[in-house]
Amino acid sequence: MAKIWRNRIEAGTQEFSKCPAKYRADVLTLMRQDVEDGVITKDQFESLTGEAY
């Protein structure tokens, strides 16, 4: 389910703030990996999550 949330957040169809608490840590981990893999930038990560990279 965390992967679905990550995909929707990155696609702009959902907001991280609406992500259920039980998935947030996993979503952040997946999104940090996406930064490392070049899928999104650090700025996009911070903008999408409101969290510092």
Q: Residue spans of the language-model regions?
A:
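Viral virion structural and adsorption modules
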Residues: 1-53
